[in-house]
Every structure is written in C-alpha cells, then in structure tokens.
C-alpha cells in the first residue's frame, strides 16, 4: 500500500479519537477507543455516501462486509468479519464527514 498522503484528525467533543489516514485512492478511518476499530473507504464510496445522505436513505450496503446506517446527526459504519464472526463499527458525525470530504477535495486540487 502507498504511504499516507495526509492524516486528518476528526476527533470532536461528541466522539472517540477518530483519525482519517488518506492514501492515494482510499481512506482508512481509525477510531482509538477501548477496542480500536479500522474501516477502509474508497474515494468513490465517500462520494456515493454523500449523495445518499442527501437522499435521506437510512441504510446502504457499501460492500459485502460493510454497511452504512444514517441517523439524524451522522453515519454509523459497520464492518462485518465473516471469518471471525464479529463486527467493528465507527460513528462519524456529519461535521466530521464534511471535514474529511474537504481534506480529500483539497488534496485533489493540489495534485
């Protein structure tokens, strides 16, 4: 995998420590909580989620193992591990999601 292009701190008063590691074509969300969680999103998936958010759809499967559940203040990402029978989840508030989108857009402008 390529090196991290940018690290964005998405932590806010309403959430655990949340960091986005931006690579050339994907983002890895890392939540440093009691049980650290990590979820990968492709740039096109982030763009699709933004469109879905404005369409007021409540739940969408991003990939076989990953779904997004929208609520009033944000989105809950749930990653299911079929091999291990467990799941990981990360909640992003819409302000955090917008901050991540802006960071990606700024990187794309500077390329």
Where do the language-model regions lie?
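Positively charged, low-complexity terminal tracts
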Residues: 1-111
